[in-house]
Amino acid sequence: MFARDLAECEKTERRVVSPDGNWESTRLLLKEDNMGFSFHITTIYEGKDFDMHYQNHLESVYCISGEGEVESRETGQKHHIKPGVVYVLDKHDAHTLRAFKELKLACVFNPPITGKEVHNSEGAYEILE
């Protein structure tokens, strides 16, 4: 058993800020923790929107605070995001995420990430060992 403090992790390399300034994410659980998934607290800054397509990972996202929407780039279907809503990318869905108000999200990735991943040109994380 172990415990981690979000505020303490935010002071370490577990906190990652996107190169484009759209988001930041503190990775509380990573592949090295041997849980079979990774767990992150991610902030999407107000007014930001961007395309992602996790071709190598499945993701579920729970909204803690803020407001936005996620749109399927395949179907155009939109889901409103607000506190208490979970959205699930269960088919490696290409999607656009929009933050109308700053979003604070709890994210779970399977397979787990190592913490060194950055989005590639298609908005995906590569599998890193």
Swiss-Prot record:
Taxonomy, superkingdom: Bacteria
Enzyme Commission code: 4.2.1.108
One Pfam family this sequence matches: Ectoine_synth
Function noted in UniProt: Catalyzes the circularization of gamma-N-acetyl-alpha,gamma-diaminobutyric acid (ADABA) to ectoine (1,4,5,6-tetrahydro-2-methyl-4-pyrimidine carboxylic acid), which is an excellent osmoprotectant.
Protein name according to UniProt: L-ectoine synthase
Keyword tags: Lyase
Known catalytic reactions: (2S)-4-acetamido-2-aminobutanoate = L-ectoine + H2O
Family stated for the protein in its record: Belongs to the ectoine synthase family.
UniProt organism field: Marinomonas sp. (strain MWYL1)
GO biological process, one term: ectoine biosynthetic process
GO molecular function, one term: ectoine synthase activity
Pathway recorded for this protein: Amine and polyamine biosynthesis; ectoine biosynthesis; L-ectoine from L-aspartate 4-semialdehyde: step 3/3
InterPro entries, per database record: Ectoine_synth, RmlC-like_jellyroll, RmlC_Cupin_sf
